Amino acid sequence: MSVFEGRAWISNQGLVDVSIEVEKGYISSVKKTNFNPNREKVDGLILPAAMDMHVHFRDPGYTHKEDWKTGSESAACGGVTAVVDMPNTNPFTSDYSQFKEKERIAKQKSVVDFGIGINVEENLTEQDWFETVPAAFWKLYPYGISSKDYFRLAQEVLGKTKKPLVVHCEHPDYMHNNPLEKLSDHTENRLIAEEKCLSEMPPSKYLHVAHLSTSNGLRNLPSQSSTEVCPHHLLLNLDNCRSLDCKVDPPLRTISDNKTLYDAYRKGTIPILASDHAPHTVEEKRSSAPPSGMPGVETMVPLMLQEVVEKRLDLSRLVNSMAEAPADRLGLSRGRIEKGQPADFMFVNLNKSCLLYTSDAADEELR
């Protein structure tokens, strides 16, 4: 048995002086304490570790960018002990055998807990494994599909699923996949695509809108649905990050969008924080036609902890959005420091800071 004493974040109580007992990887006891002078006390705060329900670890198929080992190591370095990987690897994770192969690779390489999303394709709900495959969720992309089929598939899966349907909500009719388009055109095209998509998406408690990025998108969220926001859509914008290195999907938006989304995030209207970690090689991002995406799983928690230090964000909101809310959305018993939960927590000293140098980063793209 291991014992940790310190000031910990306990759900519905806040910061409490506690003694945490851990056995076989799970919390066996959490007790209020006056601290044992003969036992070392944790220097700083004990917070629930984060769960990132939106990562792209590039394995299989694109391991020159990243694999499950480096991706999960960067997650652990950033205080993230559970991730859900998106299906747009090579091959796409679209059927049971592809799911099992990715699961095999992840079990072999990952140093954190993981879930896997499955891509929505034609006739998915008719497959004999549809109701039994242990996927974290279904994922619907707008690429290479007509708008009619996109919304039909969404309706079909939502009508039969008991798992979340995560949608990359950009309307197929309004997307332009020209890799040479300048950043301003890329942003405008994707702005129209997101808002049009959201206005046509059917309401459902199983619907989850990935990486919300605009004020109008927030206003057009389908009823009963949940959503997430990424640090780069809260902190970066077209004024402070204008180079093609900053090309992501959905794109960076305006300062006004930053402020509106941040306010909704503070209030809990946007319940979940996710990174949309999507690394590429340095050479790819520095090319004349860089692919969309940037790393984030290693920096998501530190960036938002800095927001707490600067008093722009309450610690309670951060803990809920990075640990409790994503676990609850996926129906998982984790994300809290309480008896019976996985012993996944991190030690944080808000009085210390450091610079992240690319040579220190676990993530391959940051090096």
Where are these regions (language model features)?
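Conserved active-site and cofactor/substrate-binding residues in soluble primary-metabolism enzymes
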Residues: T63-E66, T70, S94-S97, D149-R152, ...
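Divalent-metal coordination cores built from histidine and acidic residues
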Residues: E73-P172
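Single conserved hydrophobic/aromatic residue that forms the stacking wall/gate
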Residues: Y357-R367
